[in-house]
Amino acid sequence: MIHCGICGSPKIPNVEFLCAHCINGSPSILLRDKLKLLLLRQEVEQLKHDVGEQLEAGFAGNGQFGKQLQKLDVYNEKRRLIKLRQRVQLVKNKIDVKRNRYQELERYLKDEDHFDKDKKVFDVEEIVNDEALTMSKLSQVLQRKQTALFKELCQWFRIEKCDEDVNNNNNVSAYTIWGVPMINLKYSNEMDRDKQVISMRYIHQFINFSFNIWLFEGISDVSIENEQNVIQNYSQLIYDTLRLLQVRKLVSESVSIRDILIRYDLDGMIYYLSKSKYLSSLDDASNSYPPTLQNIKQLVASMIPSI
């Protein structure tokens, strides 16, 4: 008979057998295993804490890992936007085909030499009306897709307005993009140069993607590599932002560029664009100072003369 090593003497030397009762209730075994379990839990918690700190540091964008993740995010978003733009372009092509057909039928309808009977006129008018209705529906589909895609883009870039307390403490910008304060003319000299370049690049990417969504060209394909030509960078971003605002009908066609820059600055223009809010400003009724790139450069140079 084999005896338990705790409540009895083992029959086989150097071999300890434990009965079920002692395994479940012996203080010496329970305490030892419980201490081991507590130590193991402490090690696991410490490992979790260390791993969490490493991940936070990596995802924060300060380290190499964070920078690579940001590049990967931009690459993935570009691929997704290219696919979506292709779909939007297909809808636009259908609209163009319908529009051309509509115009052709209108011309045919106005040419009285083609008609011998009233029935023929009625048939052509019916076709024209059907084509016009189809084109209107396709235009609505295109607009809905563009609006939804632009909304996703604004959410992805996290264009937000800072709290008043945070804004008063920073004294840089009231708005952020991807967690970085947005550049503006008012506080251009108070912002760190490295952050200024990062902010410019984020805004440049946002504008470039926006051009793809709304299907028209800008000068945003000119890359922003450094802070050497600040006036050129500011002017380029302001010019393209103003074009987007005009396409979205968020500013007057005869807007005064000086007045809108004084009221909103570049960061405010980007924020209002992301929220699809109308920017009220004075009009340049005489069109004496049109919003050309050259005029914007002169304005930027006069508003930040110390650069």
From Swiss-Prot:
Annotated keywords: Autophagy, Coiled coil, Membrane, Protein transport, Transport, Vacuole
Lineage: superkingdom: Eukaryota
A GO CC term assigned to this protein in UniProt: protein-containing complex
Coiled coil spans: 36-113
Keyword Nuclease included in the entry's annotation: no
Cysteine repeats, as annotated region: 4-22
Cited Pfam families: ATG14
Localization terms from the record: Preautophagosomal structure membrane; Vacuole membrane
Location, primary (coarse class): membrane
GO biological process, alphabetically ordered: macroautophagy; protein transport
Membrane topology annotation: Peripheral membrane protein
InterPro entries tied to this protein: Autophagy-related_protein_14, UV_resistance/autophagy_Atg14
Similarity field: Belongs to the ATG14 family.
Function: Required for cytoplasm to vacuole transport (Cvt) and autophagy as a part of the autophagy-specific VPS34 PI3-kinase complex I. This complex is essential to recruit the ATG8-phosphatidylinositol conjugate and the ATG12-ATG5 conjugate to the pre-autophagosomal structure. ATG14 mediates the specific binding of the VPS34 PI3-kinase complex I to the preautophagosomal structure (PAS).
Free-text note regarding domains: Coiled-Coils at the N-terminal half are essential for autophagy.
Protein name in UniProt: Autophagy-related protein 14
Organism: Kluyveromyces lactis (strain ATCC 8585 / CBS 2359 / DSM 70799 / NBRC 1267 / NRRL Y-1140 / WM37)
Origin organism lineage: Eukaryota, Fungi, Dikarya, Ascomycota, Saccharomycotina
Gene assigned in the entry: ATG14
